[in-house]
Amino acid sequence: MNRNLFDFKPSEWLPVKDKAVLEHCRNIKREEMETTNENGYSIRVVPHPSSAVACELFDWIYRSDVEDKKTVIVFPNSWKNIYTSVANMCNVFNVSARNIHAFCMDEYADEDGNVAPISWNRSLGGHFMTEFYMQFREDLRPPLRQMHYYTNENINCYSEMIEEEGDGGADLIVSATGWVGHTAFIDPLTKAFKADNLEDFLKIKAGFVDNHRLTIQQNSGGVSPLWHTPRYSVTIGPYDVIHAREHLERHDLQNVGGYASWERMISRLQLYGPVCMEVPASIYQLTKGTIYVSEDMARPIEPLDLIAL
């Protein structure tokens, strides 16, 4: 971007304001994107990340069945197309999910810390149960006691529940990055995830969070009334991300036909920027896993020029 003609500072409420970092990430080329770091964090550019993630998730369930192995997975919400596809594949090929122990990644809450019940029509846990669990043939479903979602009673011990069920941590966390650079609702510039340094940040467990304004906007769908979108949530913490043994992510565009450059930008900040609290999802760089990035997401970020007529 030509800043010689007109330059300015990013708004203070944006988590990342370092212009050098922003320019570096913005200028990452398609041919430079596929990498694997020393931790085994692999970036793959594919036409349809959702299909790739669905196949990977099916493989996890298949292996848990044929190896008769308990498998603890933290699931994001709501991924209807992926979840129904995975369940349908299991139904067609008679793959049992009996060994899957599922934990919902996050949920909405009110200003008093009350967790949204799964009976609420916008409950993230409710959508997960409908879109994943209920899509399995009854004889292939996990026991209901193995499906975990947030309640008022478990929010203060949710990380411990994952840790206990998974013998130290989840076997797999499935995720995607939000507009503000979060994973789950681990939002930057919030009291819940304030820390003096990265080491302390990585110790923060599940809890209640007053969400960043960009998260509220994204949760509204970008078009719904903001006052009808909960401002608060409950979520896993960085501790849960770091202690999971494997990680599976997808980055694919959601808005205006792939023209939303801010989504491409936050993807690059997570993948190629410094590991930092300002981009919480950047901590995945410290873990083993695979992230599938869409070809649309990998397109160059080119600002529109104003042309005098």
Where are the regions that the model predicts?
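A short secondary-structure junction signal
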Residues: 159-160, 183-190, 194-197, 259-263, ...
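A glycine- and small-aliphatic-rich helix-loop capping segment at beta-alpha/alpha-beta transitions
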Residues: 86-97, 119, 188-197
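Ligand-binding beta-strand-loop-alpha-helix segment within the catalytic cores
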Residues: 19-41, 50-54, 95-174, 227-228, ...
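ATP/nucleoside-binding phosphotransfer catalytic cores, i.e., glycine-rich phosphate-binding loops
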Residues: 2-20, 32-33, 37-53, 236-309
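Glycine-rich N-terminal segment of FAD-binding domains in flavoprotein oxidoreductases
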Residues: 63-94
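Glycine-rich phosphate/diphosphate-binding loops that line cofactor/substrate pockets in enzymes
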Residues: 56-69, 241-242
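Class I SAM-dependent methyltransferase SAM-binding "motif I" and its flanking Rossmann-like core
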Residues: 175, 182-234
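Gly/Ser/Thr-rich loops at beta-strand to alpha-helix junctions
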Residues: 73-83, 154, 177-182, 255-256
